[in-house]
Curated annotation (Swiss-Prot):
Polymer. It holds the Pfam family Globin. This is Globin, polymeric component P3. This protein is one of at least six components in the polymeric fraction of Glycera hemoglobin. The keyword Transport applies. Residues 2-146 form the Globin domain. The keyword Zinc-finger does not apply.
Amino acid sequence: MHLTADQVAALKASWPEVSAGDGGAQLGLEMFTRYFDENPQMMFVFGYSGRTSALKHNSKLQNHGKIIVHQIGQAVSELDDGSKFEATLHKLGQEHKGFGDIKGEYFPALGDALLEAMNSKVHGLDRTLWAAGYRVISDALIAGLES
């Protein structure tokens, strides 16, 4: 899947509102808590246990969420530079090989959780646009993971 120039421009234009505030920490945390609520078996893969409500105060998870949001922002900023975009995400995917049993099949549900978190933060979020953007970003990362 490829994005049009208009889609790239729209993603870049909307990113500041999506990431506004605390650098994405709350958005990332919300993404993970939604993900774990819907996919409780994934808590073990990420090294967590217990109730998802308790994770809202977990500094490790907060930091991981903030890093993911930062990386999405980096990817969005590189969307119009295909080779840089692909190289950055391919490398990130390869790095994820060292984090345990991470599989490409985990990313669609994580994307759903991210879109829900974004939608609760940004009034009028273009979910179709962001679903396409996430798909392109995650596909590039998965290519690195599976290489």
